[in-house]
Curated annotation (Swiss-Prot):
Protein role: Pole-localizer protein involved in the regulation of several cellular processes.
Species in which this protein is naturally found: Aeromonas salmonicida (strain A449)
Coiled coil location: 15-42, 70-104
UniProt-recorded name of the protein: Pole-localizer protein TmaR
Subcellular location: Cytoplasm
Keyword rRNA-binding carried by entry: no
Family recorded in the similarity comment: Belongs to the pole-localizer TmaR family.
Amino acid sequence: MEQVNKSTFSDVLEYVRMSRRQNKLKREIADNEKKIRDNQKRVLLLDNLSDYIKPGMSIDEVQAIIANMRTDYEERVDDHIIKNAELSKERKDLSAKLKAMSSSK
C-alpha cells in the first residue's frame, strides 16, 4: 500500500512539474514572438533609414554600417524563430505526456 502511495505521489509531483514547464514554455514562446516582431521592425527601420541617407554623407561607410546592423538583426530573428520552434516542440511533447498521465488515472 505504501508503495502505491509513493508511486501516486511521485506521479502527482511529475504532473505538476510538467504542467509548470508547459506554462513556462508558453511564456517563453510569447516572449520569443515579441522579440521576433521587434527585430523585424528594426530590419524595416534600417531599410527605411537607408532610403533617407543623402549622398553628401560618406555613403559607403554609412551603407556598410547599415548592412552590418541589418544582418545582425536578421540573424537574431532567425535565432528566435529556431528557438521558438524548439520550445513549441517541447511544449507539444509535454502536452501529450500530461494528457496521457491524466487519462491513465
